């Protein structure tokens, strides 16, 4: 792999022929293109990023925007993976994992959607941040990496802030020319105000040319609600499955089920999937698994 130092060594013997100005110009162009799409995330070293904006999405959830060092920088996070966020709380370092809702196409910043829990150390820490304060981040982390057309159909089941990895995958797929992956999302929440990124999700569905469908499910729906009611059921999951899936000889062939949400919900979903005939997800899922748990 070329670096500035390696390039300089290769050009040095020809400096007298090329002339100092030409060598400098070549090095300058190399530096420009090397820095143009710089990825700033590091898997080992903690790096600090400043909070530049905070947008309250609901009574207990906010979107936090953090600036990257340069406007042309990208985070460098593969689709489907997450980052570690660290904070010093009561003299101890506390670390939690979050999936940004931005892609590497979104230059100069990254966004985190975080629900504040009363006993959530990092979520409370983030909620108290003021503009200009920093968080420490490293990554990428995770076993799942989305690539276009990796499966004919992705069935995604999310609850609450478990929408973030699903949203990232959906957003990337819809924006990628040539990606024909069918996407089905079941998104569960308690009440309508808890539905995160609904406007953005609905916009992606409108742009998908029919290959992305979403079913919202609420425990406490408002009057006139036309989506799902109660908890996510086995029947709701079956409806989201491809037509060649449930009850056929090639049951489940070629598609994946992705899940992310509160532990009680995930436990219930495992039971539903087992009844339909799907394997139980591993405690630590791997990319090749048909049922992947974030």
From Swiss-Prot:
What is the species listed in this Swiss-Prot or TrEMBL entry? Cryptococcus neoformans var. neoformans serotype D (strain JEC21 / ATCC MYA-565) (Filobasidiella neoformans)
Q: Which GO terms describe its molecular function?
A: 2-(3-amino-3-carboxypropyl)histidine synthase activity; cytochrome-b5 reductase activity, acting on NAD(P)H; NADH dehydrogenase activity
Coiled-coil ranges per the record?
Answer: none
Q: One short Pfam family name for this protein?
A: NAD_binding_1
Topology class, membrane: Single-pass membrane protein
Where in this chain does the record put each FAD-binding FR-type domain? Answer: 44-147
Q: Which Gene3D superfamilies is this protein grouped with?
A: Nucleotide-binding domain of ferredoxin-NADP reductase (FNR) module, Translation factors
In the UniProt record, the gene name given for this protein reads CBR1
Alphabetically, which GO biological process terms does the record hold? Answer: protein histidyl modification to diphthamide; tRNA wobble base 5-methoxycarbonylmethyl-2-thiouridinylation
- In Swiss-Prot or TrEMBL terms, this protein is called NADH-cytochrome b5 reductase 1
């Amino acid at each position: 792999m070329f670096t500035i130092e390696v390039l300089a060594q290769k050009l040095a013997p020809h400096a007298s022929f090329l002339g100092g100005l030409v060598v400098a110009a070549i090095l300058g162009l190399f530096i420009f293109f090397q820095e143009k799409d710089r990825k700033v995330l590091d898997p080992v070293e903690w790096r600090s990023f400043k909070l530049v904006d905070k947008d309250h999405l609901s009574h207990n959830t906010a979107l936090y925007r953090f600036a990257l060092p340069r406007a042309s920088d990208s985070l460098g996070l593969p689709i489907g993976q997450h980052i570690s966020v660290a904070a010093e709380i009561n003299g101890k370092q506390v670390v939690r994992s979050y999936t940004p809702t931005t892609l590497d196409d979104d230059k100069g910043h990254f966004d985190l959607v975080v629900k504040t829990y009363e006993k959530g150390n990092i979520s409370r820490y983030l909620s108290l941040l003021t503009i200009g304060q920093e968080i420490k981040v490293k990554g990428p982390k995770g076993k799942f990496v989305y690539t276009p057309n990796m499966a004919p159909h992705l069935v995604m089941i999310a609850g609450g802030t478990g929408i973030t990895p699903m949203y990232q995958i959906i957003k990337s797929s819809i924006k990628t020319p040539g990606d024909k992956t069918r996407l089905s999302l079941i998104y569960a929440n308690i009440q309508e105000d808890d539905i995160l990124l609904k406007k953005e999700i609905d916009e992606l569905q409108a742009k998908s040319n029919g290959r992305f469908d979403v079913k919202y499910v609420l425990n406490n729906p408002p009057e006139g609600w036309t989506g799902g009611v109660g908890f996510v059921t086995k029947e709701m999951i079956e409806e989201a499955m491809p037509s060649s899936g449930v009850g056929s000889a090639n049951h489940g062939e070629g598609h994946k089920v992705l899940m992310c949400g509160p532990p009680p919900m995930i436990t219930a979903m495992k039971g539903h999937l087992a009844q339909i005939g799907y394997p139980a997800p591993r405690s630590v899922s791997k990319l090749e698994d048909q049922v992947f748990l974030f």
